[in-house]
């Protein structure tokens, strides 16, 4: 797993090759706060895979959230070789994020 710093200017080059997971969150969101432990577990699981993981705080990069039409927090977008292949919004079970690693 590779943690990658991402912004509106480099998102296309980062998601272009391989598997990339964009995790949109915000400090003001109680739902995102509730999912923090699930996200941390996802990071531990992701270490076993050849993937890029990017955490985006929508209050810091509003344009990136708008570009991907992020409406609910947290939101996980999955990209494979530049194509968006999956979207997960809101609170989910920990197994859901783990399954994203296995299936995408």
Spans of model-derived segments:
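Thiol-based oxidoreductase modules, predominantly thioredoxin-like and allied folds used
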Residues: 3-6, 24-25, 43, 47-63
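Short active-site neighborhood of thiol/selenol oxidoreductases, capturing the structured segment around
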Residues: 15-28
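Non-catalytic, surface beta->alpha helical segment in thiol-disulfide oxidoreductase systems
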Residues: 72, 77-104
């Amino acid at each position: 797993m590779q943690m990658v710093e991402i912004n509106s200017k480099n998102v296309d080059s980062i998601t272009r090759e391989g598997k990339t997971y964009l995790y949109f969150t915000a400090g003001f969101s109680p739902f995102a706060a509730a999912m923090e432990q699930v996200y941390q577990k996802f990071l531990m699981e992701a270490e076993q895979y050849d993937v890029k993981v990017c955490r985006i705080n929508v209050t810091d990069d509003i344009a990136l959230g708008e570009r991907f039409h992020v409406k609910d927090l947290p939101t996980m977008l999955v990209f494979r070789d530049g194509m968006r292949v999956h979207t997960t919004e809101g609170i989910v079970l920990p197994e859901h994020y783990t399954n994203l690693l296995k299936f995408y």
